[in-house]
């Protein structure tokens, strides 16, 4: 803020207060982290010739989202979503980042389809948003603090994605 010459009060006002600024920054930080992860996934996907091998990678990813780091990231995303209720500026940041993230996921699915790794049964952008929704919605399992439920969610998510993506 100092370098830009914008007053702190102006930034706070734009995002609806200090919490809004924090939510916007956390959203941007979270999305950058997700982009790095998807870039690594996409690079590895380029080396695969089997849809089943690609799906094993997806399964591993889903099971790794159980980590405390990923739980914290989901908590921050949910907090940002809640903060957006009272701030058009935060909603704008969230919407932009969500569109960007979903476009990346859609591009990966499209590339996998074009490389013969999967044959999605639904429109690719819709599938990308379903995947994003599943990952954020996992917060419902997180708050239960039940490891058995965590495993059940993972199994159900994997089965759902297998049906939608249809690995070859």
Regions found by a protein language model. Name each.
Residues 1, 25-29, 33, 37, ...:
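Generic hydrophobic, amphipathic alpha-helix propensity
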Residues 1-25:
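Helix-turn-helix
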Residues 16-20, 24, 45, 49, ...:
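Residues in soluble alpha-helical coiled-coils and helical-bundle/repeat scaffolds
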Residues 34-35, 68-78, 88-115, 126, ...:
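Amphipathic alpha-helical packing segments from all-alpha helical-bundle domains
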Residues 60-68, 75-86, 160-164:
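Helix-loop "lid/cap" segments that line or gate small-molecule binding pockets
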């Amino acid at each position: 803020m100092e370098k830009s010459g914008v007053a702190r009060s102006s930034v706070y006002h734009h995002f609806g207060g200090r919490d809004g600024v924090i939510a916007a920054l956390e959203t941007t930080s979270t999305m950058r982290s997700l982009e790095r992860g998807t870039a690594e996934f996409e690079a590895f996907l380029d080396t695969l010739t089997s849809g089943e091998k690609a799906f094993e990678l997806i399964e591993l990813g889903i099971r790794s989202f159980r980590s405390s780091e990923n739980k914290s990231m989901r908590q921050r995303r949910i907090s940002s979503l809640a903060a957006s209720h009272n701030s058009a500026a935060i909603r704008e940041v969230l919407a932009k980042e969500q569109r960007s993230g979903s476009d990346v996921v859609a591009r990966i699915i499209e590339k996998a389809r074009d490389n013969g790794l999967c044959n999605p049964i639904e429109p690719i952008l819709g599938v990308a948003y379903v995947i994003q929704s599943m990952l954020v919605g996992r917060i419902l399992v997180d708050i239960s603090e039940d490891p058995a439920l965590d495993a059940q969610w993972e199994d159900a998510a994997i089965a759902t994605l297998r049906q939608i993506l249809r690995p070859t």
